[in-house]
Amino acid sequence: MRSVVEQGYRNVEYSVLDGGSTDRTIEILRKYDAQLSFWRSEKDGGQAAAINEGFHRATGDILCWLNSDDLHVATTLTAVAGLLGSRLDAPIVLYGGCEMFNDRTHWREVRPAISFSRGLLETVDFLNQPSLFWTRRVWEVVGPFDETLHYGLDWDWFLRASKVCQFVMTDALLSRYRLHDAQKTGAGGEKRWSELLEIVRRHSSPAVVSHYEFLVRHGSARWWLNKRMRIFQRLCRWSPKIAGSVADLLSPPFWNLPSDIDKEVLWQISGIR
């Protein structure tokens, strides 16, 4: 919360919607009560429902949401207001870079924004969610988040937005994303992959769908992709040059892939850039 209330940009409408936490959340919310436009802590319909409620209450011209584990950097809101302030009538989504970090291991890595590609977004969610901001016009055109989704609700919404809105990249670092063992992304297992398959069936090409169907059917393939991703990330942090030279050696042992399955697409789906 401090990363928001301590921003240099003051024209902020800040609402907090908590699903009834039993820790010190209410105590902390009361501490910041004077700096919040609205807050509540009670059982709700899940993350998508809470996000929809927050945006339904919002009256500002530029919108975003920040999960409880994540942070804005000190200059985020000033930078976003400068980039979007003169374009408020257009349906524009702004996205930037993000620093990933782990408090337990003290690991940090900057994940820069990359050029927007609708085709790549249909394959994998490459956007840094805490670093996305959009004009109110986007919300009016795209509509609310799908409350039936649990793991890929943001990706589904981004895909819907990409059909009717302009995505604009900034090189600025806009957020910090905290990694920990209890995250939904890492803990979802087969349920998460089944939901991702549902999303690509809605939005993506038959070729992309076939790759997700393959991964849903083959848990060992998902394991190898995850293993390769982690090894490659560690090598990149140690020596990007060596990582690039041995990337092919880290290829999962998919010797007998079906003819319609491409190893490079599987590599994209793993999330490594």
Task: Kindly give the residue locations of the regions a language model identified.
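C-terminal subregions of glycosyltransferases and related glycan-biosynthesis enzymes
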Residues: 105, 138, 149, 155-156, ...
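Nucleotide-sugar donor-binding/catalytic module of glycosyltransferases
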Residues: 1-190
